[in-house]
Structures are given as structure tokens and as C-alpha cells.
Amino acid sequence: MDDLKVLIGKVATGATLTREEAAAAFNSMMSGEATPSQMGGLLMALRVRGETVDEITGAVSAMRSMMLRVKAPVDAVDVVGTGGDGSGSVNVSTCASFIVAGAGVTVAKHGNRALSSRSGAADCLAALGIRIDLTPEQVGRCINEAGIGFMFAPAHHPAMKNVGPTRVELATRTIFNLLGPLSNPAGVRRQMVGVFSRQWVQPLAQVLKNHGSESAWVVHGSDGLDEITLAGPTFVAALEDGNIRTFEVTPEDAGLERADGDALKGGDAEANAASLRAVLEGKPGAFRDVALLNAAAALIVAGKAKTLKEGVALGAKSLDGGGALNKLKQLIAVSNG
């Protein structure tokens, strides 16, 4: 506790924490040792000053050390967004996950209930008939038998209950909004991560590299979406062969037409689930296109595609051949088995 007071004092002066100091501070918070006032003070001091790559790397270390792990193949991928983009859109990364799985890539998806929309990944999947309150062993069985599994964040990060009340009272974004997508309980090393702000694209790619990721895309749409957008360019930081490259992609790069955000407005969990199922059943339109675009990037990360156009073609085959829909049916069956 005294150590934490020293670290809070350090951050309060505008100084930055080392990875080790950040890990110690977040261990103190997530273990329940820190008081609510100490948590709130540290989280807001970091937020106001701006969190560094080393601080996020250390916080992720603490979070990963306490999570309940899931066994998954080494080549599994995660398609995940931070949420909090305020768009209220349909569940793009969830739909893309089924497309990727239908293309033959194992998906270990990590997610939560809604942050700023009316339907997060967990809400949508539950509305589709998938059981989300599974043990790590049950999720592992889904991944092995269905080729896709969903890890409901609160079930795998029980230590988060110690910081939950403080986060609710602060009612503003904190470093914890960034940590979830970086703390996959299956330990995946191939990630497609959407973030709510352009400022985090390159830093989070660096954090993933620091934690041993082999291949990753961190993305932010120019319209604010925490996905690759159809509305215009998307900012990307790609981790490939130990190097991070930043660039922009557009729908045209993938052979797709632009569409504005209104075409992707979502509803509640039931409405979003129905929209997702319609795409998996072959319905054309903007939701199909944006899901294909994001799936294409995940297929590049998985090493299945070299370009977005190639990824879109593979994804279209997954949809039109019934592979993606079959993955949904398999996950419903295995999760309820």
C-alpha cells in the first residue's frame, strides 16, 4: 500500500511509471489492496497526463497474470474492439469472427457487454442463442469442436470486480478501456484490434509487440469507428515480422463500395442478432461489406490472405458457401451442450 502511495505521488507530478511500476500498481488495484480513492486518483492522473506504452504494457502484464486462461491452438486469432466509439453500430467484429471461422481459421474471441452501444458482443451472442456464462474448460471445448469460442470478459477476469465500482463512479474512459482487448484469456498471438481513438493505434500495436504478439492490425476508422470503416479511410498499425508499419486503407482497396455510418446503425441485442444472422444467411448490403472488410484484415493477420481483396474473396466464400453460418450453428450447439 505504501508503495502504491509512492507511485500515485509520482504520477501526480507528471512523471511516468516504468513497466514494473505500472504492473505493481495495477496488481495492487486488481487484488483489492488499493482503496477506491487510490484507484480513482491513479486512474484519473494517468488519463489526464496520457498513458504511455510502458504503463499500458505493465498494466496488461498485471491483468494477464490474474486472468483465468483458456486452451486454444497457437494459430488462433481474436477480432475485437475496445467499444466506446459512441457509434451504436451493428456488431461488426462479432459477425467478422464467424466469417473468419468459416474460412478455416480458429477464432478465440474475447468480449463484453455493451459499453456505449445498446448491444456489445456478449449481448448479441446471447441473443443468437449462444451460452456465454461458460467455464474456461467449456470455452476451450467450443474452440476445439466448433473452431470458434467466446470468452466473456467478467468470467475470465474476476479480479476486475475490485476496480468495477470505481470505474462506474468515474463514469469516464480510463486505461481499463484499452486493457480488455489486449488481455485475451486464450493468449492469442494474432489479433485484429479496433480502438476508439486514433491516438491509440500505434501505441497499442507496440504493446502487443511487447507482449509477444506475432501478427496484429490495430485500427481506427476516420469516422470514429473502432473497426475498419466503409465511410472513408481507416488508420492502421500492422505488426508483421517484429516490425510495426502504419498506413491507411480504404474500402476501395478491398474492392468494396463506401457507405456512411447510418447504413450500419444498430439496435438492441435482438435486432443486432437478427441483422448478423441475416448476413450469415447471405443478405447483401453495408453490414455484409463492413464485416467482410474486417474479416479480410483478420485473415491477413492469420496468414490466410496477402491483401484485403484476397481476404474479401475468402470471406465471401465463407458466407456464400455456408461456412460462416455453420460456425454459428456449431457454436450454439457446443456452448449449450
Swiss-Prot record:
Query: Top enzyme class of this protein?
Result: transferase
Q: How is the cofactor bound?
A: Binds 2 magnesium ions per monomer.
**Residue sites binding Mg(2+) 1 per the record:** 93, 227
User: Which GO molecular function annotation, any one, does this entry have?
Assistant: anthranilate phosphoribosyltransferase activity
GO CC entries: cytosol
InterPro entries xrefs: Anthranilate_Pribosyl_Tfrase, Glycosyl_Trfase_fam3, Glycosyl_Trfase_fam3_N_dom, Glycosyl_Trfase_fam3_N_dom_sf, Nuc_phospho_transferase
Which residues participate in Mg(2+) 2 binding? 226-227
Family affiliation: Belongs to the anthranilate phosphoribosyltransferase family.
| Physiological role | Catalyzes the transfer of the phosphoribosyl group of 5-phosphorylribose-1-pyrophosphate (PRPP) to anthranilate to yield N-(5'-phosphoribosyl)-anthranilate (PRA).
HAMAP family from the UniProt entry: TrpD
Subunit-level organization: Homodimer.
User: What is this protein's record name?
Assistant: Anthranilate phosphoribosyltransferase
What organism is recorded for this protein?
Answer: Nitrobacter winogradskyi (strain ATCC 25391 / DSM 10237 / CIP 104748 / NCIMB 11846 / Nb-255)
